[in-house]
Structure formats: structure tokens, C-alpha cells
């Protein structure tokens, strides 16, 4: 759900991204009842062309995901980034499989959220062929412990930061390569 000003900014962001040569657009709009805002989402999809459009994880807030999937196909979206309506994709394997089956190759189900090397094989059984992961880890900074918190974060102390976990990324790529080499 976006205000009119926020929606105008999203449209401007899409124009800027296109001018910069990005490979695709990830966005989407819901109504206050957590259904797809058809009119605004259609506007974003049209504005994104010829780039592929991915409807983001707002999809996970939608109650009737199968109906929403069909709406997004009709609107011309190419992909849905989803954890199947749960906090993480591994918690929603059954729903992800259902979405892949319902999509019937008309739209890509891009599983995302909580994906790691120790669960990617289970997610491959859903039929998903694309995955989104952060694969980050908290890195302890060599800086001295700050006497006060400047970032108001209770999750990551100020002297630490998140960084990509190369080992985890390599492990997931290995699992994917192994799976797809057996299923080609």
C-alpha cells in the first residue's frame, strides 16, 4: 500500500533504473486488504517494459495466492518472489510446490527467504528453478566497542556489520549444480 507520492516515486525509480541499464524491475502494489492493486501494478508492469517484472514479497501477504498468481499472469508479470506466505521459503514447501504447479510455466516462482545450503535440496523438490538468498553473516568489526549505540539497532551492534558469506554462496551453487546436472 503506497501513498500517491510514494507511487510517483516508484514510477520515477523505474525510469531511472531503465536508463541505467538494469536487467529487470522488482516491485508491486497491494490494496489495504492485502489484495493486488491491479491498476497500479499494471502501471508498473507497463512502465517496466521491455524489462522483466518481478512482483515482490508483498505476495506473501495475500490470502488467496493462487488467484493472485493468475492475476499476475494476466497482468504480464514474469516472476513472483515469494516465501509461499510464510516467513521463510523452507516453511512453505507445500505452498511453493502448489504455486509452481498452478503457474504451469506461465510465470516463474522465485523462492526467497531463509534459503541456505542446508535446505536448498528440499526447496528444489518444490519445482522452483530460481532462488533468491541474502547469504549474509554478521561480521565483527575490529573497531573498539562503542560506548553508545548510534544506529538504534538492537539486532546488530554498531561495531558489527552484515556481509555476504562467500562460503554459503559457494555451497548453495554447488547444491544447485549437482541437482540440475542430474535433472537436465
Show which residues each predicted segment covers.
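Short secondary-structure boundary/hinge segments and terminal tails
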Residues: 35-36, 63-64, 90, 120, ...
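An active-site metal/cofactor-coordinating segment within enzyme catalytic domains
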Residues: 1-10, 144-155
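Alpha-helix-loop-beta-strand connector modules within alpha/beta enzyme cores
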Residues: 1, 36-57, 91-117, 152-182
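Glycine-rich phosphate-binding active-site loops on the catalytic face of alpha/beta enzymes
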Residues: 16-32, 77-90, 115, 126-149
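Histidine/lysine/aspartate-rich catalytic loop segments that bind and position anionic ligands
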Residues: 44-90
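Catalytic cores of alpha/beta
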Residues: 1-16, 60-75, 97-111, 115-133
Amino acid at each position: 500500500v503506497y501513498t500517491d507520492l510514494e507511487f510517483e516515486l516508484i514510477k520515477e525509480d523505474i525510469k531511472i533504473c531503465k536508463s541505467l541499464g538494469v536487467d529487470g524491475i522488482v516491485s508491486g502494489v497491494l490494496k489495504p486488504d492485502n489484495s493486488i492493486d491491479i491498476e497500479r501494478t499494471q502501471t508498473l508492469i507497463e512502465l517496466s517494459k521491455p524489462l522483466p517484472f518481478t512482483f515482490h514479497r508483498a505476495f506473501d501477504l495475500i490470502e488467496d495466492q493462487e488467484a493472485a498468481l493468475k492475476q499476475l499472469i494476466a497482468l504480464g508479470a514474469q516472476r513472483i518472489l515469494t516465501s509461499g506466505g510464510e516467513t521463510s521459503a523452507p516453511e512453505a514447501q507445500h505452498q511453493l510446490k502448489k504455486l509452481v504447479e498452478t503457474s504451469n510455466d506461465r510465470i516463474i516462482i522465485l523462492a526467497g527467504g531463509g534459503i541456505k545450503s542446508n535446505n536448498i535440496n528440499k526447496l528444489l523438490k518444490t519445482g522452483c528453478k530460481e532462488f533468491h538468498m541474502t547469504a549474509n553473516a554478521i561480521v565483527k568489526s575490529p573497531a573498539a566497542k562503542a560506548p553508545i549505540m548510534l544506529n538504534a539497532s538492537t539486532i546488530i551492534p554498531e561495531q558489527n556489520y552484515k556481509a555476504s558469506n562467500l562460503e554459503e554462496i559457494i555451497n548453495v551453487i554447488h547444491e544447485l549444480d549437482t541437482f540440475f546436472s542430474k535433472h537436465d
